[in-house]
C-alpha cells in the first residue's frame, strides 16, 4: 500500500541530510535532484501496485554517499529493505574509482527490480547540461558510464530504459543561450 506518510518522512530526511548542497553546475538545491529521480520512478509500475520502496530509495539514494546520515538511522527510520536498496545504490569508496560503478551495478542487480529503476532514473535526471567546469573527457566518460548503466539495468524497466537511451543519444545537450 502506498504510504504518503513514509514518503513525506523520506522527503524531509533527504532535505535535512542534503541541506546546503546544490545540484552541480547550478544554484538549485540538491533536493531538486532527488525529487526528480522519485518522479521518474513514480512513472513506472512494472506490474507492481506499490512503488513506495522505490520512491523512498529514490528520495534517499544519495544520503549514505553524500551526507553524514548513517545506515543505522536509515534502517531505524525506513527498515532493512530501504537500507539495502540505498546501500546497493551507494558506491563503495574503498574500491578503486574505476571499479565502483561495476560493483554498484552488480549489487543493484541483486536487489528487487525497483532498485534498478532508481539507478536508471538517477542517470536520466543527471544527463542534463553538464557543469561548465567539466572537461570534454569527463563528459565523454560520463556518457560511457551511462551506457554501462543502460546495458546492466535497462531490462528491469523498458520504459526507463527507453528514456535513458534517448538521453544518452542526445548527451551532452546544448547549453541554453
Task: Locate predicted features.
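Active-site helical microenvironments for divalent-metal-assisted chemistry
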Residues: 1-177
Amino acid at each position: 500500500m502506498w504510504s504518503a506518510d513514509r514518503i513525506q518522512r523520506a522527503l524531509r530526511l533527504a532535505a535535512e541530510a542534503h541541506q546546503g548542497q546544490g545540484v552541480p553546475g547550478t544554484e538549485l538545491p540538491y533536493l531538486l535532484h532527488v525529487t526528480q529521480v522519485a518522479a521518474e520512478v513514480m512513472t513506472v509500475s512494472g506490474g507492481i501496485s506499490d512503488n513506495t520502496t522505490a520512491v523512498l530509495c529514490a528520495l534517499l539514494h544519495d544520503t549514505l554517499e553524500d551526507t553524514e546520515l548513517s545506515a543505522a538511522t536509515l534502517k531505524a527510520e525506513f527498515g532493512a529493505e530501504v537500507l539495502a536498496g540505498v546501500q546497493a545504490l551507494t558506491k563503495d569508496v574503498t574500491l578503486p574509482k574505476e571499479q565502483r560503478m561495476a560493483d554498484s551495478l552488480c549489487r543493484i542487480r541483486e536487489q528487487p527490480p525497483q532498485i534498478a529503476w532508481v539507478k536508471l532514473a538517477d542517470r536520466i535526471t543527471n544527463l542534463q547540461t553538464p557543469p561548465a567546469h567539466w572537461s570534454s573527457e569527463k563528459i565523454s566518460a560520463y556518457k560511457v558510464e551511462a551506457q554501462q548503466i543502460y546495458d546492466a539495468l535497462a531490462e528491469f524497466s523498458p520504459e526507463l530504459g527507453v528514456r535513458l537511451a534517448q538521453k544518452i543519444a542526445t548527451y551532452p545537450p546544448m547549453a541554453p543561450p
